[in-house]
């Protein structure tokens, strides 16, 4: 960060806050190669690590100085127009470098805001599991929840326009448009499964998408909090969680006060809560369903009028928390009453009182998980374990390590489940699938293979947490029983592991 700040101060004095000249500097691509300001396991530079070198970077910069290479022939789409060769490599290098450059002002703004508010930076807030304690604290007191799918922009120009409030350099925005027009089909780039979370050029498009979501959430927070410039601590924490730093000091109230003079009281609700992860959000309230419907249709019109994004009211579902569960971050969560009986003694008379309290119930999604295991050939659609034939050529230790890793990840992530019986069933499927895979490799039966290895094979599937607790407490102790029954939220989980990645 100190190195970045030094470079930026130098160019501020020379270029009047222009970021465009930084793209011609070698250290920018070196920082992009090293994942720049914020290292993250979510952003893997596939192919870029193996092909990047100082010679290629120097060649790239020298070719960018030759302006005739930027001439675009729209009619001839089959030619390699930018540099003549190594188009994919150069485009990925430019996108990574540009993403690092645009992140500089956001990172510096975050540091300055933390210094002004004297906020201690908590890395625990980055964990996905940190959302569930918030659910446990707030949602039992709420009545209705809206399941909102944030629509993707139809055109990438919308994403570029959201950066104009933060990036005051027109040359950088023009370069971004040139890059997107040159290398991508704007109509198909933002499909959620193939592009915006793709491994190639992921950092740049996460930056664009986060700027779009940040713009949407900043206006939503303004209407919710009716505050100036969104300088609340809660908004700062929200932007820290999405890795997109603090919103620029932009007079939001001057823009929207004239457009919504009678709307602020219309949506005033002190009990409304908002949670989001990627493109899915939950909007919960203690008020009546009428207010939730007003929020629903307001969001639809807001997306259509402000972002020119088509959305339908059917994409937003309003459910009563006491009667319906909501799917969020892989858990099926619901609010159920927890009735406790209290015996009261008054002089010679005694009577029983039922004390009903609402409690958040987080369930393990057994049916979708079996479908995921069946998709990657660990079991059939009925949940019956089968051998993993594609792993039969690997060594025994490699096969066991793969199964143990998947089982450990599932146990670690779903440790907050209220009822772990379904989780144990999934672990049983993985154990038996591992045994069948090893038996198939050695051309033996499952029974014979288990007799030869004994119980040591199954001990490999105990998670690290279970091993530690089993050493500290006896198997019959009440503490260990509470460990197996209770919910545990870990603050070191930054992403959801996909089973397909273990193919």
Swiss-Prot record:
Entries under InterPro entries matching the protein: Domain_X, Maturase_MatK, Maturase_MatK_N
Keywords assigned: Chloroplast, mRNA processing, Plastid, RNA-binding, tRNA processing
Name of a matching Pfam family: Intron_maturas2
Record GO cellular component, one term: chloroplast
GO BP term, example: tRNA processing
Domain of life where this protein originates: Eukaryota
GO MF annotations, alphabetized: RNA binding
Keyword RNA-binding: yes
Principal location: plastid
Entry's localization field: Plastid, Chloroplast
Similarity annotation: Belongs to the intron maturase 2 family. MatK subfamily.
Function description: Usually encoded in the trnK tRNA gene intron. Probably assists in splicing its own and other chloroplast group II introns.
Protein name, UniProt field: Maturase K
């Amino acid at each position: 960060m100190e190195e970045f700040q030094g470079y930026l101060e130098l160019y501020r004095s020379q270029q009047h806050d222009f970021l465009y000249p930084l793209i011609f500097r070698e250290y920018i691509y070196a920082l992009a190669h090293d994942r720049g300001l914020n290292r993250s396991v979510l952003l893997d530079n596939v192919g870029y690590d193996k092909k990047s070198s100082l010679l290629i970077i120097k060649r790239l910069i020298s070719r960018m100085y030759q302006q005739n290479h930027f001439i675009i022939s729209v009619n001839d789409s089959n030619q390699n127009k930018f540099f003549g060769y190594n188009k994919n490599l150069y485009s990925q290098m430019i996108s990574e470098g540009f993403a690092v450059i645009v992140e500089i002002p956001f990172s510096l703004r975050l540091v300055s805001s933390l210094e002004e508010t004297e906020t201690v930076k908590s890395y625990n807030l980055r964990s996905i599991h940190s959302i569930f304690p918030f659910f446990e604290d707030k949602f039992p007191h709420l009545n209705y929840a809206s399941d909102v799918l944030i629509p993707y922009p139809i055109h990438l120009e919308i994403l570029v326009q959201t950066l104009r409030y933060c990036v005051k350099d027109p040359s950088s925005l023009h370069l971004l448009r040139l890059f997107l027009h040159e290398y991508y089909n704007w109509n198909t780039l933002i499909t959620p499964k193939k592009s915006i979370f793709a491994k190639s050029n992921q950092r740049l498009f996460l930056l664009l998408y986060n700027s779009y979501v940040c713009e949407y959430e900043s206006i939503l927070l303004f209407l919710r909090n009716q505050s100036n410039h969104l300088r609340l601590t809660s908004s700062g924490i929200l932007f820290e969680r999405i890795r997109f730093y603090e919103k620029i000091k932009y007079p939001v109230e001057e823009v929207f006060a004239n457009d919504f003079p009678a709307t602020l009281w219309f949506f005033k609700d002190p009990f409304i809560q908002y949670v989001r992860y990627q493109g899915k959000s939950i909007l919960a309230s203690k008020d009546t369903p009428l207010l939730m419907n007003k929020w629903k249709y307001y969001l639809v019109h807001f997306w259509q009028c402000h972002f020119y994004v088509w959305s339908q009211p059917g994409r937003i579902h309003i459910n009563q928390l006491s009667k319906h569960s909501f799917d969020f971050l892989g858990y099926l969560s619901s609010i159920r009453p927890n009735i406790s009986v209290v015996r009261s003694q008054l002089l010679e008379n005694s009577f029983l009182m039922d004390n009903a309290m609402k409690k958040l119930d987080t369930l393990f999604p057994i049916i979708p998980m079996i479908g995921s295991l069946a998709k990657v050939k660990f079991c059939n659609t009925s949940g019956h374990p089968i051998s993993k034939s594609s792993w039969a050529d690997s060594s025994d230790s490699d096969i066991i390590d793969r199964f143990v890793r998947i089982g450990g990840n599932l146990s670690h992530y779903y440790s907050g489940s209220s009822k772990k019986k379904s989780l144990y069933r999934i672990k049983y499927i993985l154990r038996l699938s591992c045994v069948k895979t090893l038996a198939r490799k050695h051309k033996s039966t499952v029974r014979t293979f288990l007799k030869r290895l004994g119980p040591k094979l199954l001990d490999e599937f105990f998670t690290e947490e279970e091993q530690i607790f089993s050493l500290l407490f006896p198997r019959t102790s009440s503490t260990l029983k509470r460990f197996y029954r209770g919910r545990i939220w870990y603050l070191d989980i930054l992403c959801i592991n996909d089973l397909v990645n273990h193919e």
